[in-house]
Amino acid sequence: MISIDIYAEKSLTISNLPLTIKDNDLIIGRCLNISYISYLYFSLPPVPANTIENASLVLFKTGTFLNCLKTKEAIAIHPLLDYFSSRTNMLNRPKYDPALTQGDITEGTVSTEIDLTAIVNSWAKGQLVNKGIVLSKEEQQYFGFSRYGSAYTKDPTLKPVLRIVCKESPLPFL
């Protein structure tokens, strides 16, 4: 098996209220009347689709989490159909594919790992163009938010990682 770790190249958190953070955290969820949605982009190397065993997004916790008792813990992740930029806001969000979503979520002490095998395979097979992913809370009617390191975090150990595990290939593909 070969494991490839790809660090996030771009990230963005948007909210229905102006954010005061300096791109150090991805925030996902809702607190009172404030909703947070985050975006990530990874520049993928050419990986043959038939060699991908699994792919997972590893997010590193950075601090404050607010999870009320009724908050559904699942994070919803979907592949983007359009690009995001620093001009993205709640009024002009990129479209995403609602049918394609993440797999299992594993909660650790310092990180959260989310299965993205279906999404990464769709990119590798050319079914979708990699324009990034959107992260939001599955149940926005409940209160709760999570904070993770972003692509712009000063601490490199907190940057989001896309980990792709491949079968060994007789030919190099990197």
Predicted feature locations:
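Conserved catalytic loop of SAM-dependent methyltransferase domains
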Residues: 7-14, 115
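Residue-level detector of buried hydrophobic side-chain packing
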Residues: 42, 55-57, 77, 114, ...
